[in-house]
A protein has these predicted regions:
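...captures the hydrophobic TM-helix bundle architecture rather than a specific catalytic motif
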Residues: 1-158
């Protein structure tokens, strides 16, 4: 995944430098693009959920900055605001899953969580409105909601 992200980022930077060659704000644009790449690399190389979360939030922030690059254009402002609102929906899923994850595992480290997942799966389920939901399934559901929000899927796109 690391090689893929670096390769695609290289191609995007190369294309952007040619496309934006005459723009007086190319330095700002390439800074935003590099920031996006940095946070994406942080996201995919994370060793724990805290680092993953910081990368996740950074990707959202840098996406907003890139979408709103030409901030004097009304449509760019509207699109950026819409993107940040949709991202907030996804972030709710991540926030909530991390809260439950720490409650169940007492750790954010991937290794600890992956070693304990079978034990937590066997624990008593969480009862919500008389429905018994397994703790791991509950966490995975909200992580999935976070991914849906970040990629603007299932009713969050227009």
């Amino acid at each position: 995944m690391l090689v893929l992200v670096v390769f695609v980022s290289f191609l995007v930077h190369l294309y952007s430098m040619d496309y934006m060659a005459g723009d007086p704000h190319i330095i700002r644009f390439l800074g935003y693009l590099s920031l996006f790449t940095f946070f994406m690399l942080m996201l995919i190389t994370a060793g724990n959920f805290v680092q993953l979360f910081l990368g996740w939030e950074g990707v959202g922030l840098s996406s907003y900055l890139l979408i709103n690059f030409w901030y004097t254009r009304v449509q760019a402002n509207k699109s950026a605001m819409k993107a940040i609102i949709v991202n907030r929906f996804g972030d709710f899923g991540i926030y909530f899953s991390l809260l439950v994850l720490f409650f169940c595992f007492k750790s954010f480290d991937f290794g600890v969580i992956f070693n304990l997942v079978d034990l937590v799966y066997l624990q008593s389920p969480i009862n919500i409105f008389n429905f018994a939901i397994n703790r791991v399934d509950f966490i995975v559901f909200f992580l999935f909601l976070g991914a849906i929000g970040k990629s603007a899927q299932l009713g969050l796109h227009t």
